[in-house]
Design a protein with these regions (language model features):
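Small/polar beta-strand repeat architecture
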Residues: 92-181, 211
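Recognizes the extracellular SEMA beta-propeller fold with strongest preference
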Residues: 1-95, 167-340
Length: 340
C-alpha cells in the first residue's frame, strides 16, 4: 500500500459527503476533536450553562451587559433571562389602556378607556409616553372610576402626544399568544434587547428588574412578521394594521438616540424620519432581513433586495438584487465572511 502524506489535516469535518468525495485534509467523522485555524485539536467537552429551562425554548440569544452576560430564552408564551446562576421571568405584564393624558403644570390627569380598578395611594408605572415627564412610577389620587391624577417632577409643557403604557401595582403576567410556527425575531439596538413573535406587539427589555415592555411609539393595533435592528433604526417587515395584512411593506422607526430606543414609527410626521416602503414588484412575500456590510438584505420568498441608508428626504433606498433566490423562513440565513 502506498503511503500518502497529507500535510494539512485541519480543514474540518464534513459528514454529508462520502469519504471518497472529500478533499485531502477533510474528515468524514471525528470524536472528541474540533478543528480551528487549520489545526485539529482535542475537544474538552461540553458543560451546561444553565439548568433545564422552564419552558421549551424556541428562541435563545445572548444579551451582553457591562458586568455579565445573560441568556434570553423564549417559549411560545413566556420569556426568561438566565445569568447562569439565577433565572428570572421577564414575560410582559398586563397593561391598562390610556385614553387621555393631560396636565396643569406638574399635575397630570390620566383617563383610562375602562374602569381601572385602582385606589388612592396605589403606585403605578407609566412608560413610553411623550413628553418624557409623564414616564415613571407615581403615587396616584383616584378622582373617578376611569380617572386619576399624579404629580410629576417637572412641567412637561404640553399634554401627552404619545400616551404610552400603564401598569398597576399588582399587574398580572400577560402570556404571549404565538405558536411554535411563530418564530421569534429581534436583536439588540443601543444596548436594549428587542423581541417580536409576529402575532403580539413587539417588546423590549433593558436587562434590569423590569419585565418586557411594548416598543415606544408602536401602535397597539399593529404587528410585524419580522423585526430587526439596523444602524440606528428598527426595521419591520410584513406589517398588519388593524387586522389588514400588508405582506409587501417595510416599515422603519425614527433614528434612535444613543442609549435609547426609537420613540416614533409615525410615517406621516414630516419632521421625523420614520417611513414605509412597498416591495411589491414581485408577488412573493417578505420573510426576513439580515445585514451584509453597509446594507440590509431584505429577503422575500424568491427574491432579494438591498436596503441602503441615503439620508433625508428619502432616508432609505431599495434596490433589487438579480436572481430568483429568497429565504425559506425567518431565521434561515446567517452572516459569514463570504456573505449569507
Amino acid at each position: 500500500m502506498t503511503i500518502v502524506k497529507i500535510s494539512d489535516v485541519g480543514k474540518g469535518l464534513n459528514a454529508d459527503l462520502t469519504p471518497e468525495e472529500l478533499q485531502m485534509g477533510v474528515w468524514s467523522d471525528a470524536r472528541n476533536m474540533r478543528f480551528a485555524n487549520g489545526y485539529a485539536q482535542r475537544f474538552n467537552g461540553l458543560a451546561p450553562i444553565f439548568a433545564a429551562p422552564v419552558v421549551e425554548p424556541y428562541y435563545i440569544t445572548a444579551f451582553q451587559k457591562p458586568n455579565k452576560r445573560l441568556w434570553i430564552h423564549a417559549g411560545t408564551e413566556r420569556v426568561f433571562s438566565d445569568d447562569e446562576s439565577v433565572r428570572t421571568e421577564i414575560t410582559r405584564l398586563a397593561e391598562i389602556t390610556i385614553s387621555t393624558l393631560t396636565h396643569v403644570t406638574t399635575t397630570a390627569t390620566l383617563k383610562t378607556s375602562a374602569a381601572h380598578g385602582l385606589t388612592t395611594g396605589n403606585s403605578v408605572t407609566i412608560y413610553g409616553a411623550y413628553p418624557l415627564q409623564y414616564n415613571g412610577t407615581f403615587t396616584i389620587t383616584v378622582t373617578a372610576p376611569d380617572t386619576f391624577t399624579f404629580t410629576m417632577a417637572s412641567d412637561p409643557g404640553a399634554d401627552a402626544s404619545a400616551l404610552g403604557h400603564l401598569t398597576g401595582p399588582s399587574a398580572a403576567t400577560a402570556n404571549f399568544t404565538g405558536t411554535r410556527d411563530d418564530r421569534w425575531t429581534g436583536g439588540v439596538l443601543a444596548g436594549i434587547q428587542v423581541l417580536n413573535n409576529g402575532v403580539d406587539v413587539p417588546q423590549y427589555w433593558t436587562g434590569d428588574a423590569n419585565k418586557l415592555r411594548t416598543l415606544p411609539g408602536w401602535n397597539a393595533g399593529w404587528t410585524a412578521a419580522s423585526l430587526r435592528p439596523w444602524k440606528n433604526y428598527l426595521i419591520a417587515l410584513d406589517i398588519t394594521k388593524s387586522g389588514v395584512r400588508n405582506p409587501h411593506m417595510i416599515k422603519w422607526s425614527v433614528a434612535a438616540v444613543p442609549g435609547s430606543l426609537p420613540d416614533s414609527w409615525d410615517e406621516t410626521d414630516v419632521t421625523r424620519d420614520a417611513g414605509e416602503l412597498p416591495v411589491s414588484d414581485t408577488a412573493d412575500l417578505l420573510v426576513d432581513a439580515l445585514p451584509m456590510g453597509d446594507v440590509l438584505i431584505i429577503y422575500k420568498e424568491r427574491s432579494m433586495y438591498a436596503l441602503r441608508f441615503i439620508g433625508a428626504p428619502y432616508i432609505f433606498q431599495l434596490q433589487r438584487i438579480p436572481g430568483d433566490s429568497g429565504m425559506l423562513f425567518r431565521g434561515c440565513a446567517v452572516s459569514t465572511p463570504l456573505g449569507h
